[in-house]
């Protein structure tokens, strides 16, 4: 049976707002976890191959720093056309203590994450265009037990594009193209490729009606 994890959080944040639309913040944080729940991969017999389950580790510590900001540029009169750039970056150190295992990073926690957003908004014509880029560092996808190595998800970036058009006061068209870079998703175990595939492009189109 799994035990409910207990987490103590502490953080310190500095924020600066040079204008109503611009901002910058810097934060440091710390987490102390008892009985963290992690996904593990273990040996299995027969056709099952390696099986996955969840288990509690003894404890974990996590600490890091985060920087976040937003800057908006006026391209027209009275901010009727604007371009904005927003970013978020975090660096995280984690360490897990578990029975019969060497200290390692927390499952599912990359050591760094990066996000960049660039957006254009034309209020007069009703057009909005947003480009989003996310990048995550390598992390443990499954903890290896029974002498199995950990399964790692390699670092990967993803680029998405969102378009929005106000057809009327009540009707809005929104289209989203996901995974423009189509970077490979790659899992490794013991230095060898465990699984590799491409997610492909995703396309979503929706009409929103407000009444």
Language-model features: locations:
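Residues that define the transmembrane beta-barrel architecture of outer-membrane proteins
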Residues: 6-10, 59-65, 108-114, 155-159, ...
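Outer-membrane beta-barrel transmembrane strands
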Residues: 2-18, 23, 29, 63
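Short, glycine/charged-rich beta-strand-loop motifs at protein surfaces that mediate ligand recognition
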Residues: 146-153, 159-164, 171
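C-terminal beta-signal and adjacent terminal beta-strands/loops
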Residues: 34, 135-143, 163-211
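Outer-membrane beta-barrel proteins
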Residues: 1-3, 58, 150-152, 194
């Amino acid at each position: 049976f799994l035990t409910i994890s207990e987490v103590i959080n502490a953080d310190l944040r500095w924020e600066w707002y040079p204008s109503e639309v611009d901002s910058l913040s810097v934060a440091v944080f710390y987490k102390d976890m008892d009985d963290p729940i992690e996904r593990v991969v273990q040996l299995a017999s027969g056709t099952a191959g390696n099986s996955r389950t969840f288990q509690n580790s003894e404890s974990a510590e996590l600490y890091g720093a985060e920087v976040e900001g937003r800057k908006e540029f006026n391209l027209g009169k009275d901010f009727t056309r604007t371009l904005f750039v927003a970013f978020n970056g975090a660096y995280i150190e984690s360490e897990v203590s578990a029975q019969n295992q060497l200290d390692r990073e927390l499952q599912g926690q990359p050591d760094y994450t990066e996000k960049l957003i660039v957006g254009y908004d034309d209020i007069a014509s009703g057009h909005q265009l947003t480009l989003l880029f996310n990048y995550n560092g390598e992390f443990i996808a499954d903890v290896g037990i029974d002498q199995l190595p950990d399964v790692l998800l390699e670092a990967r970036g993803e680029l998405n594009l969102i378009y929005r058009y106000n057809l009327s006061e009540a009707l809005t068209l929104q289209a989203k193209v996901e995974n423009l870079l189509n970077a490979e998703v790659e899992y490794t175990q013991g230095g060898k490729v465990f699984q590799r595939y491409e997610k492909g492009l995703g396309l979503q189109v929706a009409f929103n009606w407000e009444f």
